[in-house]
Amino acid sequence: MAASAAETRVFLEVRGQLQSALLILGEPKEGGMPMNISIMPSSLQMKTPEGCTEIQLPAEVRLVPSSCRGLQFVVGDGLHLRLQTQAKLGTKLISMFNQSSQTQECCTFYCQSCGEVIIKDRKLLRVLPLPSENWGALVGEWCCHPDPFANKSLHPQENDCFIGDSFFLVNLRTSLWQQRPELSPVEMCCVSSDNHCKLEPKANTKVICKRCKVMLGETVSSETTKFYMTEIIIQSSERSFPIIPRSWFVQSVIAQCLVQLSSARSTFRFTIQGQDDKVYILLWLLNSDSLVIESLRNSKYIKKFPLLENTFKADSSSAWSAVKVLYQPCIKSRNEKLVSLWESDISVHPLTLPSATCLELLLILSKSNANLPSSLRRVNSFQVAFLKM
């Protein structure tokens, strides 16, 4: 294959389950030099009179050059082609609570944004998933006896941690000696027929980080607190606080939530809503087996793209496992009819996050969409994005 380019953008999406790949070589700039492109099992090579650029693929991915098909040139985008691959991508999600020994260690809860210690040296003896919101209906339909837990809330004991879709429930009774996170002010509300007003906290009071003032969660009762997964890092007390860029952490947590929920409940459509019940984003999970490799600039040096690196620097790797989603922004009263349809559909699952995090996620999706080749940015009325895992 031959083309002319001064700089060429390379985009490669590998699908682990389908064992296929989409390769896009960006449209060259005017006046670019002739360039020969070679596709080899472990690399892509681009030669110009000035030199050679080679892009090394991760060890887990091998292309099948002879399977090249669907070759076409898309104006404004570049050269498109599809290939078969031999890919062994690790898609197993690792939770901090997967290992039974982890629950016997002392853990420390940190604010992810600033590293403030929220709960120190908590020994978690039981880490349990919460039942789904349809649990009561299932019991009533399939069991011959009434549900003994009807209309009762599940509250963790002193050394428990209950895991919801996007949050942790913990008991703060044993943490009273510590400096606790701030609570939002109580609100005035009328509670009697005589319209006498008294101070009464909201049903779910915001829990705020004292250092950075980020919303971490909500109080469920006098002893139980809900912490959102996107705001808290739970780490063994023997380890130091891990510094992770905010955008990387948010999209990784959301991606894992989507994958786990789709696997457990066969749910692929989600509404992302704030703690104020306002819907910010409609998300549709397309697939969770993508490996995206991209080179944003041409260089005469060899570029290597390891599959997963232990560093979280944004420029350290251009290869990453990801989930592919369709999304619709719903801020400023956009897509109101579609939001209403999705909210009334029992197959759509709501995910509640702090309102500020919903806006962060929308920015992350928008940036991902803007970085895609132009032909991949839309599917019908939905926008396309990748969330790194």
UniProtKB/Swiss-Prot annotation:
Pathway(s) of this molecule: Protein modification; protein ubiquitination
HECT-like as annotated region, ranges: 353-389
Modification N-acetylalanine, positions: 2
Location of the protein in the cell: Cytoplasm
GO biological process entries: proteasome-mediated ubiquitin-dependent protein catabolic process; protein autoubiquitination; protein monoubiquitination; protein polyubiquitination
Binding, Zn(2+): 144
Motif annotated as BRAT1-like motif, chain positions: 129-159
Interaction with UBE2C as annotated region, ranges: 235-257
Presence of keyword Lyase: no
Enzyme nomenclature, EC number: 2.3.2.26
Domain comment in the entry: The C-terminal half (AA 188-389) is able to bind cyclin-B and shows a self-ubiquitination activity (mono-, poly, or multi-ubiquitination) in a HECT-like sequence dependent manner.
Function (record text): E3 ubiquitin-protein ligase which accepts ubiquitin from specific E2 ubiquitin-conjugating enzymes, and transfers it to substrates, generally promoting their degradation by the proteasome. Independently of its E3 ubiquitin-protein ligase activity, acts as an inhibitor of CPSF3 endonuclease activity by blocking CPSF3 active site.
Name under which the protein is recorded: E3 ubiquitin-protein ligase E3D
Organism expressing this protein natively: Homo sapiens (Human)
The gene coding this protein: UBE3D
